[in-house]
Amino acid sequence: MATLDGINVKDIVKVERTSVHSHITGLGLNDRLEAEYVSGGMVGQVAARQAAGLIVKMIQEGKIAGRALLVTGEPGAGKTAIAIAISKELGEDTPFVSIVASEIYSNEINKTEALTQAFRRALGIQIKEETEVLEGEVISLEVDRSANGMGPKVGKLTMRTTDMETIYDLGSKMVDACLKEKVMPGDVIQVDKASGRVTRLGRSFNRSHDYDAMGPKVKLVQCPDGEIQKRRETVHTVCLHDIDVINSRTQGYVALFSGDTGEIKAEVRDQINKKVLEWREEGKAKFVPGVLFIDEAHMLDIECFSFLNRAIEGELSPLIIMATNRLIEKVRGTDVESAHGIPSDFLDRMLIINAIPYTKEDTAKILSIRCDEEGVKLQPTALDLLVKLQEATSLRYCIHLIAASEVIRIRSKAEIVTTDHIGSAYRLFFDTKRSEKILTEESAGFLQ
């Protein structure tokens, strides 16, 4: 807390949540799609990352929509990390929907409807819209109010660019919009002619000396050039599921926010598909096939796989990425055993990426990256201890120990996390193997 002229000023504390995969920023590939050993928050898994990079390239070029990809490997081998890295590489414009296979089982909607909704959320459409806007620096804003304050407000707005200056007469709606945005002379604004929406772009550099001090939210921008009235092309990206929900009932947009979508009729989706294909042929819209990631894919039953068999071959279908850690498993709903718990006919349609277990060096680097992500300083000996513990426990358990050790370090008022702090956290929190051992030794005391 700082003191300014006898007044206590509190520092603004930025709260950031760090998840298990928050350190991942991409696949870490170069221009030739070759994976670097440590890059983008990813460590090792060179072959798997290169394969995922090829998938990303084909998605961006629109060559692999309607396919299925399976990521296999042991627990803790980085399967989900690869999927998240793919989503980061694709960017915000490409829809990426992540679900767990058990999510589709519900009493409210059937399995195929839940899968269809997930499919449609992973299908985007970019709609182009041309709008006319007024953009310039405000020279003056005059508002005339009636004497009793009850009548409509009118006003005049003077705007200029580097090339011209114009005066506009404002009605009551535009006056209210300007007052709501607190528009004042020197502001650079943008007015949408169709909707009347006023947007403050910032403060003009020409008026930067009007005040000695300005708040952190004040943005200084150049005065626009050219004509005040311009045509702007805006691209809106929406998913097909949102369009389905809005058109499924009278007040569909309410269900869009509440999440109570229910089952949507096939006729509604067929009409939307026809309209989307028409827009694509006319050049009004661009179809963006996204990615549907299904974790724990072995939890899907035979009915889901039979539905997916046909769904991935449709004209409007995203890329499906599945992940599983099972070897040989019975296909749910049958007595037939198959690799990864997935029917053989569906496996034949998939490209398979194998995530190999991390080496000791990989683990040390991952733990070091996690420490940097969480802002924890470790002694070299403490990091070595974590690597040894990982061999006896698991990588996830050791990642959890980092945060616990940091709390113990703060309580003991030490400057850096040592082996003693790691040991204290290890004794307080049990891993799976030690917990199973205690259950076996003290089984008589538990309810059977």
Swiss-Prot record:
Keyword set includes DNA damage:
yes
Detail which positions bind ATP: G73, E74, P75, G76, A77, G78, K79, T80
Q: Name one GO biological process term.
A: chromatin remodeling
Outcome of gene disruption: RNAi-mediated knockdown results in gonadal detachment during gonad migration. RNAi-mediated knockdown upon tunicamycin-induced ER stress in a cdc-48.1 and/or cdc-48.2 mutant background (insensitive to tunicamycin-induced ER stress) restores the expression of ER homeostasis regulator, ckb-2.
Q: Which reaction does it catalyse?
A: ATP + H2O = ADP + phosphate + H(+)
Write down the EC number: 3.6.4.12
| Pfam hit, one | TIP49
- Principal subcellular localisation of the protein: cytoplasm
Q: Where is the protein found, in the record's own terms?
A: Cytoplasm; Nucleus
Name the organs or tissues of expression.
Answer: Expressed in gonadal cells.
Determine if Signal is one of this entry's keywords: no
One CC-aspect GO term = cytoplasm
Q: Which SMART domains match?
A: AAA
The record's keywords, sorted A to Z, are: ATP-binding, Chromatin regulator, Cytoplasm, DNA damage, DNA repair, Helicase, Hydrolase, Nucleotide-binding, Nucleus, Transcription, Transcription regulation
Superkingdom of origin organism? Eukaryota
Q: Name one GO molecular function term.
A: ATP hydrolysis activity
Q: How does it assemble?
A: Forms homohexameric rings. May form a dodecamer with ruvb-1 made of two stacked hexameric rings.
Q: Which family does it belong to?
A: Belongs to the RuvB family.
User: Briefly, what is this protein's role?
Assistant: Possesses single-stranded DNA-stimulated ATPase and ATP-dependent DNA helicase (5' to 3') activity suggesting a role in nuclear processes such as recombination and transcription. May participate in several chromatin remodeling complexes that mediate the ATP-dependent exchange of histones and remodel chromatin by shifting nucleosomes. Involvement in these complexes is likely required for transcriptional activation of selected genes and DNA repair in response to DNA damage. Has a role in gonadal development.
Protein's UniProt name: RuvB-like 2
- Please tell me the species this chain comes from: Caenorhabditis elegans
Upper lineage is:
Eukaryota, Metazoa, Ecdysozoa, Nematoda, Chromadorea
Question: What is this protein's gene name?
Answer: ruvb-2
